[in-house]
Amino acid sequence: MDLRRITDFDAPELNVYARLTENQLLNRADPQNALFVAESSLVIGRALDAGCAPVSFLMETKHVTGKGAALLARCPGVPVYAAEEDVLTNLTGFHLTRGMLCAMRRPPLADPAAVLRGATRVAVLENVMNPTNLGAIFRSAAALGMDAVLLTSAGSDPLYRRAIRVSMGTVFQVPWAYVPEDWPALLRAQGFRTAAMALRDDSVRLDDPRLTQAEKLAVVMGTEGDGLADATIAACDFTVRIPMHHGVDSLNVAAASAVAFYQLGRRA
């Protein structure tokens, strides 16, 4: 084990945990060296299971031989930076609720056609900007039977630290890919019907048999606040509304996705 006690807060090896922004980690100028940071033994383990390559660990000293030991055994030779809890809090500026972080290399982006191969139920997220919502959507997608998640390029990044944390690492379990602007054509070519979740007078019921009996179905969710673009709704086969009560007109996109995935993530 390459254990390194933290003695210098300014060591450049610690920049990834304390000083680099998410955009700097993304490293668009040199994507082969782009990184992300995973938090907690569960999430780090899921990232390793998905084949993500670790660069270094940062953890409380007690976890080196405690709950982090099994992870470290899977990563021989990877530097492990360790210190007591109060030292790590001073370094990162926040309390490590799970006691460990792991910097990892970003995997190559998946091809959307490959992600769709063999899938029958997928989610399409149009410009979902909030990483907390994005992480929650991934967790629901994993739990409720969605085979893949497709994202437009203007939305949040599934490998932002908050998105990873909220998803409980399911961003490493559910296949996902960014889609081109003409993604409705891509889905049609793969045999998918598309269901736009939107507040429209002509919306069909969530339990409409045409949806539940579709061989392949894509559930399309829009950005926070504005929802789906009119052009997107027009390009979809169905517009679907979740029934509301007590004067509530809509749900947060993360909550709405859970309802939609539960109903539509399975065939009748």
Residue map of PLM features:
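Amphipathic alpha-helical repeat scaffolds
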Residues: 40, 129-137, 251-256
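Glycine- and other small-residue-rich loops at beta-strand/loop junctions that grip anionic moieties
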Residues: 6, 36, 126-127, 152-153, ...
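Active-site/ligand-binding-proximal alpha/beta "capping" segment
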Residues: 196-248
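RNA substrate-binding interface of SAM-dependent RNA methyltransferases
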Residues: 4, 105-202
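Boundary-proximal intrinsically disordered activation/regulatory segments immediately upstream
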Residues: 1-67, 155-156
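Structured adenosyl-cofactor binding patch, chiefly the S-adenosyl-L-methionine
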Residues: 100-102, 140-144, 153-172, 230-268
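A glycine-rich helix N-cap at a beta->alpha junction
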Residues: 74-93
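Short, aromatic/basic amphipathic alpha-helical patches
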Residues: 66-77, 232
